């Protein structure tokens, strides 16, 4: 199966998540060759709920996003992401759940939610920490990984190439 996001800025919404969940019944490739692999979760959509004080709907949406990311991570079939361009926030979180990432060299990746006062919620924080825990520096000092990831996420830092994104 192949999934390609097609919303404005390839922002994630319920339809995107449904497509991802349903596609994991077979090996899956998540790809997008536009300027954005995915600019993350559709914040305009969630702000509409906030404007109506409908926080239950925001909670439901976030939970569904978390379930979708977990579904990708623990799929019985291989999941491959092939991102290019902007891969931010929720788009990053979808990408890091994959078994394999074949990234274009023209990429900007990161968890940028803190820049707008939000906390990443799709499992990207734990995936980033897991990768940093495997570095030689973290094996010598386990606090190294935690501090490095806290710095990256806390400041909404991005990497501008696949090699820069590696721990």
For each predicted feature, which ranges?
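Short, exposed beta-strand "edge-strand" segments with a Pro/Gly-rich flavor and a Y/T-containing core
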Residues: 8-11, 38-41, 157
């Amino acid at each position: 199966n192949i999934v390609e996001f097609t919303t404005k800025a390839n922002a994630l919404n319920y339809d995107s998540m449904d497509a991802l969940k349903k596609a994991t019944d077979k090996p899956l490739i998540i790809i997008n060759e536009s300027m954005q692999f995915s600019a993350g979760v559709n914040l305009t959509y969630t702000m509409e709920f906030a404007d109506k004080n409908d926080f239950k709907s925001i909670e439901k949406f976030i939970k569904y996003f978390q379930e979708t990311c977990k579904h990708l991570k623990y799929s019985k079939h291989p999941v491959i992401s092939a991102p290019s361009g902007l891969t931010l926030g929720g788009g990053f979180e979808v990408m890091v759940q994959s078994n394999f990432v074949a990234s274009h060299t023209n990429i900007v990746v990161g968890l940028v939610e803190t820049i707008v006062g939000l906390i990443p919620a799709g499992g990207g924080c734990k995936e980033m920490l897991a990768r940093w825990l495997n570095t030689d520096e973290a094996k010598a000092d386990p606090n190294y990984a935690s501090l490095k990831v806290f710095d990256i996420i806390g400041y909404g830092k991005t990497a501008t190439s696949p090699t820069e994104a590696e721990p």
